[in-house]
Design a protein with these regions (language model features):
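Conserved H-X4-D acyltransferase segment
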Residues: 1-23, 165
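A short, structured surface patch at a secondary-structure boundary
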Residues: 15-69, 73, 77-79
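A structural signal for short loop-to-beta-strand junctions that line the ligand-binding cleft
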Residues: 3, 48-61, 99-112, 116
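Extracytoplasmic substrate-binding proteins
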Residues: 87-166
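Structural recognition of the beta-strand scaffold that forms the well-ordered cores
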Residues: 8-11, 29-32, 77-81, 98-102, ...
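Solvent-exposed loop/turn segments at secondary-structure junctions
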Residues: 13-16, 34-37, 77-78, 83-87, ...
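Extracytoplasmic
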Residues: 2-5, 23, 62-65, 86, ...
Length: 166
């Protein structure tokens, strides 16, 4: 649909990307339980409080969906991984469009994914803004490569990175 009003997003990382492109999550009606857990433990809880009551029973952590439940919920778009072709056919048979996307394996793949989601969500301008920002940022850092390479060991900045993965 040109302007999806009720989206189900079984693919784990895509709810965050949908939010980033739309600027809200008001039209997301179902996300996987693991994505909901991620929402609870992140800044998205403050940015997208509308996800507090989102359904987590129609889509599963293994990307599978309850086709009948999605139809009953009047879902008008499903965003999922390209490995879910059988489910996509079932959804299409019920009149529910399904956009299947590839998991990004590199930054070019991620930019393609953002562009494809922008097209599906009617957020093409925002998707272009995101990919342009990435290109500009990479150009900036690449322009500093020679400068950084010329630094001595003592001049190199030190960074400590903490990461908590559940």
């Amino acid at each position: 649909p040109a302007h999806p009003k009720r989206i189900a997003v079984p693919a784990m990382v895509l709810p965050n990307m949908v939010y980033a492109l739309q600027g809200n999550a008001e039209n997301m009606v179902s996300i996987p339980p693991a994505a909901y857990s991620g929402w609870e433990m992140s800044i998205l809880k403050d940015l997208a409080p509308e996800l507090e009551d989102v359904d987590t029973t129609m889509v599963n952590d293994d990307f599978s969906v309850n086709v009948e439940a999605l139809a009953d919920a009047d879902v008008d778009l499903v965003l999922n991984w390209d490995s879910e072709t059988d489910q996509a056919e079932q959804l299409k048979a019920l009149g529910i469009p399904c956009v299947l996307v590839s998991s990004a394996k590199d930054m070019d793949g991620l930019k393609s994914l953002v562009t494809m989601l922008g097209d599906a969500l009617n957020c093409e301008d925002r998707a272009k803004q995101v990919t342009d920002w990435y290109d500009e940022t990479m150009d900036y850092f690449n322009s500093k490569a020679d400068e950084v390479a010329a630094l001595s060991e003592d001049e190199m900045p030190r960074v400590l990175h903490f990461q908590n993965v559940h």
